[in-house]
């Protein structure tokens, strides 16, 4: 068919020899389809590639901008691995791409994103935004999404926060043209008729516990009371006190948040309890919304991801490119079977569509697109997919 955007993937496993990595990527480019007038690259790589200088060398060898993140596990085409550098190249004669990097988001992140966006877009409204950010505990993904939606006038946003495989997430960089950053966001702005399709897998409805909890007191992403009682009592009721007091065990307690405004529920996680025994959440918890705790397991992750990829491939005739991000918690639920989710998705794609898959520290994806504006959301525990 007639493709507005074509895609191809390149990869290297060569961490320590930048020249060899560049040669490998160039050879793959030469074998692939010719690049069209406008191109942009989306990178996902293990942090060792930025520390060794290989990511920088590879990006500098390419005649277009490259933006993306560190990831703990990547897949490109039919290759997958943890110690991998992958780039999905989007190329088009009709669609053009602008990239930007913000100033530091350490203070007033909303203001910094807004300034950078306005300068780069020059008042021209894009048709799609891809967003890439480091993992910064002090900033909320909801905050990023809220400001991008507002300043763009409701343009669909899709993207990811970085995630690594260290125990304390210390190497979670955003990567832009080969440089790596702990405190800046990059954006790819699309101009032209892109017509992306978005898909989202969270927990199956039958995995939700039927104990709804109305949020009666909260402050930003700190949850204080549900159903008029301290949140710690809610965990006691559910028999989850031990989990709630264990660092990182909280991330295996997903919940769906219903904002009560008719928009689809959004998957969120708890990060832990603070000294006051309030729950710290990965996202803003508005008073008056309702949360439904869920049960998270390998079987359901594979079921929901498999369902979404099969749906996308059956609904879209001749898809030209596929980009997917899956939450690190989905990967953790695989246990020792590290590649199970990626293998399932790659098997469905069967090499027919250029695809990049990577793990994520938080997913940005619209839950609805309507004529007026996209409802962009920040998710946890999800597998998100953008297909052209």
Which residues does each PLM region occupy?
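Small-residue-enriched flexible segments
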Residues: 3-40, 44-65, 69-335, 339-348, ...
């Amino acid at each position: 068919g007639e493709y507005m955007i074509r895609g191809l993937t390149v990869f290297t496993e060569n961490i320590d020899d930048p020249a060899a990595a560049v040669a490998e990527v160039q050879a793959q480019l030469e074998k692939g389809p010719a690049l069209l007038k406008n191109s942009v690259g989306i990178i996902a790589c293990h942090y060792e590639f930025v520390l060794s200088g290989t990511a920088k060398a590879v990006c500098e060898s390419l005649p277009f901008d490259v933006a993306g993140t560190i990831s703990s596990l990547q897949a490109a085409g039919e290759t997958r691995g943890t110690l991998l550098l992958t780039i999905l190249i989007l190329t088009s004669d009709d669609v053009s791409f602008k990239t930007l990097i913000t100033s530091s988001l350490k203070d007033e992140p909303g203001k910094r994103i807004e300034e950078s966006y306005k300068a780069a877009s020059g008042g021209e409204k894009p048709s799609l935004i891809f967003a890439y950010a480091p993992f910064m505990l002090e900033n909320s993904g909801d905050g990023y999404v809220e400001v991008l939606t507002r300043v763009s006038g409701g343009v669909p946003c899709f993207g990811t926060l970085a995630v690594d495989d260290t125990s304390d997430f210390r190497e979670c960089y955003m990567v832009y043209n080969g440089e790596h950053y702990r405190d800046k966001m990059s954006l790819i702005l699309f101009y032209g008729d892109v017509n992306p399709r978005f898909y989202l897998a969270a927990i199956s409805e039958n995995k939700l516990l039927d104990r709804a909890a109305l949020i009666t007191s909260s402050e930003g992403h700190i949850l204080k009371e549900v159903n008029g009682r301290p949140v710690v009592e809610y965990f006691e009721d559910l028999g989850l006190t031990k989990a709630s007091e264990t660092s990182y065990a909280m991330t295996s307690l997903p919940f769906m948040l219903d904002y009560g405004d008719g928009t689809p529920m959004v998957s969120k996680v708890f990060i832990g309890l603070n000294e006051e025994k309030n729950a710290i959440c990965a996202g803003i918890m508005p008073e008056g919304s309702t949360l439904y705790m869920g049960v998270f397991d390998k079987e359901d992750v594979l079921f929901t991801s498999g369902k979404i990829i099969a749906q996308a491939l059956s609904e879209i005739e001749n898809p030209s490119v596929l980009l997917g991000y899956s939450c690190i918690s989905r990967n953790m639920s695989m246990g020792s079977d590290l590649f199970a989710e990626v293998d399932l998705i790659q098997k469905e794609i069967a090499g027919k569509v250029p695809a990049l898959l990577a793990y994520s520290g938080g997913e940005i994806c619209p839950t609805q697109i309507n004529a007026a504006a996209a409802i962009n959301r920040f998710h946890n525990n999800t597998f998100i997919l953008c297909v052209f």
